[in-house]
Amino acid sequence: MSSISPMPRTAPWPLRLAHEADVSALEALIPLSVRALQSPYYSQAQIEAALGPVFGVDRQLIRDGTYFIAEQDGVIIGCGGWSKRRALYGGDGSREHEDELLDPQRDAARVRAFFVHPDWARRGIGRSIMATCEQAIRDSGFRTVDIVATLAGEPLYAFFGYAVVERYDIAMASDMSLPVVKMNKRI
């Protein structure tokens, strides 16, 4: 596990909101990111079982205008976002019902679906997206944030001051499970 270093004052890549037209590129990036960056923490079988139901594109984040993309020369090299809805994780099709809106006065916002191209890992992309998400969360009136972090993502969120609430396993198909860490922060 590498240590997290401070991000440069200005990131060399622009961040923008994701659009429906980005879905195909995101669908290519996510498995690439997960297979490379999660492999020190999860077995290949766990990774393959999690692609889609746990690790996948959630178009609701795009429709809500809460999902950000980092680009370099027009290529998506990272993505991540936040949600004002109940779900803590999962891609399209992982929920059987409408994902209800949260109340900023009572509920915690969710940080969701961070993925970075393996060739661009550990260069500050996740930190840049996280800082943008936290500002948007504050601007939307939320004062607390929940995350269900992968074991690989836990150091990034700890760097930002998120505290471990609990460790648990997400049940998946074929009697597989994925260990994760629920984390929380007051912003």
Question: Residue ranges of each PLM-predicted region?
Answer:
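Conserved N-terminal entry element of GNAT/NAT acetyltransferase domains
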Residues: M1-S24
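Hydrophobic pocket/interface hotspot
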Residues: L26, D58
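Conserved GNAT-fold acetyl-CoA-binding loop/helix
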Residues: P31-V57
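Conserved acyl-donor/pantetheine-binding loop and adjacent beta-alpha core of acyl/acetyltransferases
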Residues: D64, E71, I77-A121, A131, ...
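Glycine-rich phosphate-binding loop
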Residues: G124
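C-terminal "cap" of GNAT-fold acetyltransferases
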Residues: R143, I147-A152, F160, E166-I187
